[in-house]
Curated annotation (Swiss-Prot):
<feature type="transmembrane region" description="Helical">
    <location>
        <begin position="183"/>
        <end position="203"/>
    </location>
</feature>
<keyword id="KW-1003">Cell membrane</keyword>
<keyword id="KW-0813">Transport</keyword>
<feature type="topological domain" description="Cytoplasmic">
    <location>
        <begin position="240"/>
        <end position="243"/>
    </location>
</feature>
<keyword id="KW-0812">Transmembrane</keyword>
<feature type="topological domain" description="Periplasmic">
    <location>
        <begin position="28"/>
        <end position="33"/>
    </location>
</feature>
<dbReference type="GO" id="GO:0005886">
    <property type="term" value="C:plasma membrane"/>
</dbReference>
<feature type="transmembrane region" description="Helical">
    <location>
        <begin position="7"/>
        <end position="27"/>
    </location>
</feature>
<feature type="topological domain" description="Periplasmic">
    <location>
        <begin position="204"/>
        <end position="218"/>
    </location>
</feature>
<feature type="transmembrane region" description="Helical">
    <location>
        <begin position="34"/>
        <end position="54"/>
    </location>
</feature>
<keyword id="KW-0029">Amino-acid transport</keyword>
<keyword id="KW-0997">Cell inner membrane</keyword>
<dbReference type="GO" id="GO:0015173">
    <property type="term" value="F:aromatic amino acid transmembrane transporter activity"/>
</dbReference>
<feature type="topological domain" description="Cytoplasmic">
    <location>
        <begin position="289"/>
        <end position="293"/>
    </location>
</feature>
<dbReference type="InterPro" id="IPR000620">
    <property type="entry name" value="EamA_dom"/>
</dbReference>
<feature type="domain" description="EamA 2">
    <location>
        <begin position="158"/>
        <end position="285"/>
    </location>
</feature>
<comment type="similarity">
    <text>Belongs to the drug/metabolite transporter (DMT) superfamily. Aromatic amino acid/paraquat exporter (ArAA/P-E) (TC 2.A.7.17) family.</text>
</comment>
Length: 293
């Protein structure tokens, strides 16, 4: 396989991941926030056994296995439930944007905990990403304090889970980089996520799961998307141009919002797109800070 082809396959993973906000929200409307997420990750985990493979548990570094599984499961649960508990389709897309603070936070964590060199660009990068999220939450008025507070109070749990999830994923990336030693535990982690969600589903009161044709289509699409995205990303990381893939991944907030708007039939305002571009720009500045550090 040529390097260009592998890079293209890796970039396809970014496109696939960008559909997850819309698909997870669509599935949760029929199967419930918890039941829908449990079904998605269970099916995805089974698919990953065939696309990525099941690792030999004993060979995986214990630190990575324990910390990685805890952080990965926690993050995926935060993400899925933040989207499922959102009050409206538009709010689900906003919640997804809050979660996209993770690229900037990942670089910050790499600087703080992994000794990543950096320069002054990291400060405006982090600030721009944070302002971008606030701009999105301000609705049509942009950076408007009262609108931001009013928006958050309509569904505080969703925004809280998305915000905490961004920090958890940044921590997961830091742990993986430091302790994985080339091992990939993604199949185990996704299966653990599904199992954890099923335990939560059966131990707590949950809405009835309503299986309709549209919901089943979205469920299968979400499971296959997640399964093939991780497989495609692995190909890109192993054989492609990692720099191009890294830059491409920082435009995920815009692509994800656009695809979610189509999947959920939720048109977005010009102010939203301004905020989304700020989040992307902030992430790119953080990345450039490490390249020139």
């Amino acid at each position: 396989m040529t390097r260009q082809k592998a890079t293209l396959i890796g970039l396809i993973a970014i496109v696939l991941w960008s559909t997850m906000v819309g698909l997870i929200r669509g599935v949760s409307e029929g199967l419930g926030p918890v039941g829908g997420a449990a079904a998605i990750y269970s099916l995805s985990g089974l698919l990953l056994i065939f696309t990525v493979g099941f690792p030999r548990i004993r060979q995986i570094p214990k630190g990575y296995l324990l910390a990685g599984s805890l952080l990965f499961v926690s993050y995926e649960i935060c993400l899925a439930l933040s989207l499922g508990y959102a009050a409206t389709h538009h709010q689900a897309i906003e919640v997804g944007m809050v979660n996209y603070l993770w690229p900037s936070l990942t670089i910050l964590f790499a600087i703080l905990f992994n000794g990543q060199k950096t320069n002054w660009l990291i400060v405006p990068g982090l600030l721009l990403a944070l302002v971008g999220v606030c701009w999105v939450l301000g609705g049509d008025n942009g950076l408007h304090y009262d609108e931001i507070i009013n928006n958050i109070t309509t569904s505080p749990l969703s925004y809280f889970l998305a915000f905490i999830g961004a920090f958890i994923w940044a921590a997961y990336c830091t742990v993986t980089n430091k302790y994985a030693r080339g091992f990939n535990g993604i199949t185990v982690f996704v299966l653990l996520t599904g199992a954890s969600l099923w335990v939560y589903y059966f131990l707590t009161p949950q809405p009835e799961m309503i299986f309709s044709t549209p919901v089943m289509i979205k469920l299968i699409s979400a499971a296959f998307t997640l399964g093939f995205a991780y497989a495609a990303w692995n190909v890109g990381i192993l054989h492609g141009n990692v720099t191009i893939m890294a830059v491409g991944s920082y435009f995920t907030p815009v692509l994800s919002s656009a695809l979610a708007a189509v999947l959920l039939s939720a048109p977005l305002s010009f102010s939203f797109w301004q905020g989304a571009l700020m989040v992307c720009g902030g992430s790119l500045l953080c990345w450039l800070a490490t390249r020139r550090g």
